[in-house]
Amino acid sequence: MTTAAPATWTFEEAIDRVGLGRFQFKLMAICGAGWAADAMEVLLISFALPAIRQEWGLSTAQAGLLGTAIFLGMLAGAWFWGTLSDRIGRKLGFILTVLIDSGFGLLSAFSPNFATLVLLRALTGFGVGGTLPVDYAIFAEYLPRKQRGRYLVYLEAFWALGALVAAGLAWLIVPRVGWRPLLAISALPGLIVFWIRRYVPESPRFLLVHGREEEARAILRQVARENGA
């Protein structure tokens, strides 16, 4: 890929030219790990709920509120982070959403009472609600047109992987040491993903739309070099 090429191609043509290669495979693994970690956070409460109800003597209504708290947070998070990523860029949300959901997920393990746990699960959902659309956007914007639909479907498969891991951990942990270790351990993958995501560049499409052409060209050259284009 020549240094002059991005000035004469449209963005979609430039992405097609840099092709599908090592960069996109790494990005899919990074996004996919985040999706798997989010699936664990969303589903683990359903596995932990019987033990929590027994420990705190929750009513059916309280159990229902605890089970849905994360989805209420996701509703708010999807709107907030989706809007923010269109205004200031994908990368900030790409990093912070995982930190938020894994951080509050970890704090959930130390909840002293029911109300605190509900609040922390809602805040966890606020992060999860942002991770899903922001990851989808940044991954899609690095994919060539011909492979875009197929690889976005591949990304969604990581959610199923996270669900299987959550079920396996719950089966191993909850009967032996209780629900708190399950919540703590399930937050660790997200913290690792947060650390790795700091090195992912901003979406070149976002940069072009906002007039930052030189930065976009530099990133496209980086992707081309990594893919051997």
Features from the language model and the residues they span:
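Transmembrane-helix signature of 12-pass secondary carriers
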Residues: 1-229
